């Protein structure tokens, strides 16, 4: 039997996981993140609030949208590692522009590279799945995600301590972040180059392995929802399609056609569609909040005139979000029945928090509202990820995640062009948060109506079932109207 199909040693996953976690820690240890707007507001940069809000920050959204599609494809085609290295190079380039650049144009260039950073982040989370066997997926996912939360929290705490206790200039925080990103690049050099990837380079593993497909390339979550005969038949059909069209030039077309068919099958589920819609719309609004909340804080309490606690707030918010996400695993809830109601309730909490942040003059109320927003979103997005991924293989989950993220970026771009951009309405930051609050209120209203429909339908079905079980076996059953459907 080919050695490529043998069970890997029990410690074969340890080395790439450790290196990737070290990379993740230093790439996410960014003390500068919480003090970007105060830094740009300093006399040395001499940027006004309208320039930052309406001219500089929107570039991140446009750059993220423009670079995500090619990055999504190239990440898999290049097998992750080169894109991981590009991730930190873009980070370093952005920090260099922020530190040494002057004027709106160079700050826009820095935001462009921040967009590249955001787009290439997918390589960090996708890399490890190409290096370890499926039985380690849950463990390594936990490590890789947890280390980024720890690093971001630690960076925010350090930044707050340095600013509050030593009066360290904001620029020094960016030098620290630049040094950490450089260390992350050093660790990226030691990442093993994957021999396979999720889509483009998966065929080599099938060719090298005479076992059925489910033993080599299909994740366990996919196996739990298919029979062995179905998996073997699917693998045989896939091989037949590849053999019938051996031209290398058509390989990309085959992959894209296969992706399209997978997406068509995935989105045929109404349940997945509704959760994906919430994911896309809520993520678009949430990203807008993250992008402009520091501008709102600067408006409520200018950093030149008062003490600010952005770092402490970011640390607490990140920790609160982690706790909210962690709590999802211990909730015993019928999400099929009550999931949309949960989306409605917590979307309403986000909307109320944004209204409070807009109308209150207290910076502490703004901080508290932000904590509620971040915790509520982290709680809901964890549920959404679980609901979407529960019946999908890893490959299909990656596709759905990519499409949902792209749709969210399209929505966010439209929102930015209309609400924020100087070529649009160019609204002040306080009015923007009024718009974002109304946006989440609409989301809450839509899913509240959806949840009422689901609960009423479930109640009607239960009453019909109870009536059927209590009827005498000798009584004739009335004919059910053909135009009544209890499926939702």
UniProtKB/Swiss-Prot annotation:
Annotated catalysed reactions: thiamine(out) + H(+)(in) = thiamine(in) + H(+)(out)
Residue span of region Disordered: 469-488
Tissue and organ expression note: High expression in kidney, brain, lung and small intestine. Detected in pancreatic acinar cells (at protein level). Also expressed strongly in pancreatic islet cells.
Effect of residue 169 to S: Can mediate pyridoxine transport
Organism: Mus musculus (Mouse)
GO biological process, alphabetically ordered: pyridoxine transport; thiamine diphosphate biosynthetic process; thiamine transmembrane transport; thiamine transport
Glycan attachment sites: 46, 358
Sequence ranges on the Extracellular membrane side: 30-54, 104-111, 167-172, 298-310, 357-369, 421-428
Entry's Gene Ontology molecular function annotations: thiamine transmembrane transporter activity
Stated family: Belongs to the reduced folate carrier (RFC) transporter (TC 2.A.48) family.
Functional summary from the UniProt entry: High-affinity transporter for the intake of thiamine. Unlike the human ortholog, lacks H(+)-dependent pyridoxine transport activity due to an absence of seven critical amino-acids required for pyridoxine transport.
Subcellular localization: Membrane
Residues annotated as transmembrane: 9-29, 55-75, 83-103, 112-132, 146-166, 173-193, 277-297, 311-331, 336-356, 370-390, 400-420, 429-449
GO CC terms of this entry: plasma membrane
Protein's name according to its UniProt entry: Thiamine transporter 2
Effect of residue 174 to N: Can mediate pyridoxine transport
Keyword Protein transport: no
Gene3D superfamilies with a match to the protein in the record: MFS general substrate transporter like domains
Top-level taxon in the UniProt lineage: Eukaryota
Impact upon substituting residue 87 to Q: Can mediate pyridoxine transport
InterPro entries for this protein: Folate_carrier, MFS_trans_sf, ThTr-2
Keywords annotated in UniProt: Glycoprotein, Membrane, Transmembrane, Transmembrane helix, Transport
Pfam families named among the record's database cross-references: Folate_carrier
Membrane topology of this protein: Multi-pass membrane protein
Gene deletion effect: Thiamine uptake by pancreatic acinar cells from knockout mice was found to be significantly lower than uptake by pancreatic acinar cells of the wild-type littermates.
Cytoplasmic topological domain: 1-8, 76-82, 133-145, 194-276, 332-335, 391-399, 450-488
């Amino acid at each position: 039997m080919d050695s490529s199909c043998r069970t890997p040693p029990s410690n074969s996953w340890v080395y790439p996981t450790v290196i990737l976690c070290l990379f993740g820690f230093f790439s996410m240890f960014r003390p500068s993140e919480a003090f970007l707007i105060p830094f740009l507001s300093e006399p040395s940069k001499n940027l006004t609030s309208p320039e930052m809000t309406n001219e500089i920050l929107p570039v991140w959204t446009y750059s993220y949208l423009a670079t995500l599609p090619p990055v999504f494809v190239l990440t898999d085609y290049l097998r992750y590692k080169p894109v991981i290295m590009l991730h930190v190079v873009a980070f370093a380039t952005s920090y260099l522009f922020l530190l040494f650049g002057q004027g709106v144009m160079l700050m826009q260039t820095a935001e462009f590279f921040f967009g590249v950073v955001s787009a290439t982040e997918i390589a960090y989370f996708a890399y490890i799945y190409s290096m370890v066997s499926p039985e380690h997926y849950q463990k390594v996912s936990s490590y890789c995600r947890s280390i980024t939360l720890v690093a971001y929290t630690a960076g925010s705490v350090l930044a707050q301590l340095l600013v509050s206790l030593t009066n360290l200039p904001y620029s020094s925080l960016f030098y620290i972040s630049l040094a950490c990103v450089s260390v992350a690049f050093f660790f990226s050099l030691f990442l093993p180059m994957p021999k396979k990837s999720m889509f483009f380079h998966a065929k080599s593993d099938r060719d090298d392995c005479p076992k059925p497909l489910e033993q080599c390339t299909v994740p366990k979550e996919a196996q739990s929802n298919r029979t062995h005969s179905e998996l073997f038949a699917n693998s045989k059909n896939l091989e037949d399609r590849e053999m019938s069209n051996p031209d290398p030039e058509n390989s990309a077309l085959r992959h894209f056609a296969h992706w399209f068919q997978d997406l068509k099958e995935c989105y045929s589920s109404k349940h997945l569609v509704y959760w994906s819609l919430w994911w896309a719309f809520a993520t678009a609004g949430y990203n807008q909040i993250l992008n402009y909340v520091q501008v709102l804080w600067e408006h409520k309490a200018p950093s030149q005139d008062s003490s600010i606690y952005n770092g402490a707030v970011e640390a607490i918010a990140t920790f609160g979000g982690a706790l909210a996400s962690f709590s999802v695993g211990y909730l015993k809830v019928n999400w099929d029945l009550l999931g949309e109601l949960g989306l409605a309730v917590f979307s309403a909490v986000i909307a109320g928090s944004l209204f409070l942040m807009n109308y209150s003059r207290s910076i502490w109320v703004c901080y508290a509202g932000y904590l509620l927003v971040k915790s509520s979103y982290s709680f809901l997005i964890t549920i959404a990820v679980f609901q979407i991924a529960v019946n999908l293989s890893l490959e299909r989950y990656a596709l759905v995640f990519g499409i949902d993220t792209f749709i969210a970026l399209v929505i966010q771009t439209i929102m930015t062009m209309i609400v924020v951009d100087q070529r649009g309405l160019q609204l002040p930051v306080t009015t923007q948060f009024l718009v974002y609050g109304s946006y989440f209120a609409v989301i809450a209203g839509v899913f509240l109506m959806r949840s009422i429909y689901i609960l009423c339908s479930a109640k009607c079905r239960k009453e019909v079932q109870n009536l059927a079980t209590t009827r005498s076996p000798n009584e004739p059953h009335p004919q059910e109207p053909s135009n009544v459907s209890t499926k939702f």
